[in-house]
């Protein structure tokens, strides 16, 4: 996100974001011109998630290449409202936080299209849903142990979760998975299929379609 009065940023590449956010940028990348010579010599004021946030972990891994690897001279907050206020009040600001807060504050912010190697892609529900907004979109899962599922109340909750997730996710301005993802997970639950498609490792840039293909092989 940038300030809505920022007229020169239309899109940014992952490489440009890395140049700004990697630990070695601290004390060296201080203005927009330091990132791209075509941009003005205007001070960058950075805003982002705090180090205890899952958003921080994912952003640093997706952009810098290593989770929790980030420059430290930025305004960090677990409260996204603080980040919204900071970016909206500073013409030179750049920041990141969850999509839901952008939707709630669209008039105060300017979303920047990200080029992950296939051209700039705007952060829209459609682009997240079709898998093209990469690498900054990620799925969020729940995991349930086989032993826990022996408890009727846990099994009932998970079934409720899968059947009710889509409308509830929309209500809080997140983006639901495709319907077939929920039905597929209900089938796995009924058959007590165990395992994870990630094999115990974090992976960045996977689409839901790719994950579902892996899941079918469990």
Enumerate the predicted regions with their spans.
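Flexible loop/hinge segments at secondary-structure junctions
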Residues: 1-218
